[in-house]
Amino acid sequence: MELCVVRHTKPRIESGLCYGRLDLELEEGFCQQAERISQSLPLPFDLTYCSPLKRCTQLADYLGLSYRRDPRIREIDFGEWEGKRWDQIGKAAIDAWHADLCSYRFPGGESFGDLCDRVDDFLTSLPNKNILLITHAGVIKALHHLVEGVSIEAAAEFSV
């Protein structure tokens, strides 16, 4: 199986807000970034899978791709933190998360380990084909762990 992974371009959201499952559209100027992505894709693909969140489907639609939506490649669920300013979440909560990046479960959400389990389930269901994924930073970090064998802690800190 050949896997090509693309992260959505910058979403339309106020700087400094926590977002994962928030269903955000892309910034108005996303077309320029999308054109660069389009030019760099090693086409064709047998299948394209896309997160069902708008910021991914909007990019796939702009690129003119036929795709399947799959909820297993949605971004991590930050639960009660979604849409809050990082400075409103509180230092103690953020420190607890940073102390245990793999297992810390966001209140009302999921942990990075949960995300990895979800992405692993997705990976094992894929056919042996040339596949494009349009997804999120958290999913790409999980793939870094699952496909490349990087420790889960290192994958959680991987910059996308």
Q: What does each model-identified segment do?
A:
Residues 150-160:
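Domain-level recognition of soluble alpha/beta enzyme cores
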Residues 129-140:
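A glycine-rich beta-strand to alpha-helix segment
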Residues 6-65, 110:
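Active-site-proximal alpha-helix that buttresses catalytic centers in soluble enzyme cores
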Residues 63, 147, 151:
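Active-site catalytic pocket residues across diverse enzymes, especially alpha/beta-hydrolases
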Residues 41-44, 125-129:
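Glycine-rich phosphate-binding loop signature in dinucleotide/nucleotide-binding domains
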Residues 63-118:
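Phosphate-handling substructures
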Residues 50-51, 117, 134-135:
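Short beta-strand scaffold positions
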Residues 1-4:
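Extreme N-terminal starter segment of soluble prokaryotic enzymes
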